[in-house]
Regions:
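N-terminal targeting or signal-anchor segments and their processing/structural boundaries
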Residues: 1-372
Length: 372
């Protein structure tokens, strides 16, 4: 499978239904492809695939031979994109989600100690900042779980120049700051120092003092702003030119952050009593909002009670992953290993949270589909 076109094949209609007629009595392997091209050959990099674990013994007409397609993880590691950005950082996109990645500058080796590396949340993209850009070329090694994966070379021209514009995003909820969270500023490049003299807080047009700005211990691109904010008050923080000094002596241009501290009464609590039909199995329960963004994730094996506090009023939903291999995340399927993607149960009940209200619910996770 995957090396040549199948000798027997058909296509589905718009609803996914298919038929194969006039087959002789025999034993068959059945696969499904959702192709990007039309070559009828499985291309792991681009196509989705489905399969039946067991062969079909065709000795009479068969109905309801159903397959679900999925996207496999790449079996062979590859860097699918790389570039030297206009700010001098190195960017790489990978075709695999790494588990325990380690990145090193091997040439010039002197650049390795001061490098800064930031992976995205799924470990399939990374950016590297170097504190010296006088090199002609640089080699980067990528390892995962102690295994060498690849070495990538970046080259630059001697006359190349770079522009660094410091930009700060935030965690505001529209015009409001969640009273249960500090104000967080996340920058597009590493910040090396903060000048607290280059800022002021305006509340009713009166400059204020007492603010602290510290680097987040888990994310070097993020700074936490703390101040004794008062609920329902409007604030504006003004940062002057050069308040933040970034890597390679870059400076920010003046910017403001305006918001009102929301009231705690606008948030609620959801308590879930979770009952499992199969003891000893591991589950991952995710709470998602209307946009299907995961706002919380919990892992457990037996009946439990989960409490989600200080949630913004709105509609929420629950989905549960049957975590077969107990690694704390959803895993796709694998044709070679004859493994299906991990099943997901979507709770039909909408779990709305109202302002200043505690909601108690019970959900029962059914047996995993396909188990006896």
């Amino acid at each position: 499978f995957g090396k040549k076109k199948a000798s027997i094949y058909t296509t589905t209609d718009s609803s996914g239904n298919y038929q194969l007629k006039n087959l002789r009595k025999d034993t068959y392997r059945v696969y499904a492809l959702k192709e990007q091209s039309s070559d009828k050959i499985y291309q792991q990099a681009t196509d989705e695939v489905g399969f039946l674990k067991d062969s079909v013994v065709l000795d009479q007409n068969k109905t309801n031979v159903n397959l679900e397609v999925f996207k496999e993880d790449a079996s062979i590691f590859r860097v699918v994109d790389r570039k030297l950005n206009s700010d001098g950082s190195l960017l790489m996109s990978l075709n695999q989600k790494l588990r325990k990645p380690v990145v090193a500058i091997i040439e010039p080796a002197a650049l390795d100690a001061a490098k800064l590396v930031k992976f995205n949340s799924t470990n399939d993209s990374l950016r590297i900042w170097l504190k010296d850009l006088t090199f002609d070329s640089v080699k980067v090694s990528i390892n995962d779980e102690g295994k060498a994966l690849d070495t990538i070379k970046f080259s630059r021209g001697k006359k190349d120049t770079y522009t660094r514009n410091i930009v700060a995003s935030d965690n505001l909820e529209g015009e409001f700051l969640n009273p249960n969270k500090p104000l967080r500023l996340t920058f597009n490049l590493p910040i090396e120092s903060v000048d607290l003299g280059g800022r002021r807080i305006i509340k009713k047009k009166i400059p204020r003092t007492g603010i602290t700005i510290t680097r987040d211990s888990l994310d070097f691109l993020t700074y936490v702003v703390r101040y004794p904010w008062v609920a329902k008050r409007k604030y504006e923080i003004s940062f002057a030119d050069g308040a933040f000094t970034g890597i390679l002596a870059s400076k920010n241009k003046a910017f403001n952050k305006s918001f009102t501290l929301n009231s705690r009464d606008n948030y609620g609590t959801l308590s879930l009593k979770v009952q499992t039909a199969e003891k000893g199995k591991q589950y991952i329960l995710q709470v998602v909002n209307e946009n299907e963004h995961i706002v919380s994730s919990s892992t457990f094996q037996n009946d439990t009670t989960l409490k989600f506090t200080n949630y913004k009023a709105g509609k929420y939903f629950v989905r549960v992953i049957y975590d077969h291999n107990k690694n704390g995340k959803w895993d796709t399927g694998n044709i070679k290993l004859r493994v299906y993607p991990e099943k997901v149960y979507n709770e039909a009940k909408e779990l709305s949270i109202k302002a200043n209200w505690d909601r108690n619910e019970t959900i029962t996770i059914p047996k995993e589909p396909g188990t006896i």
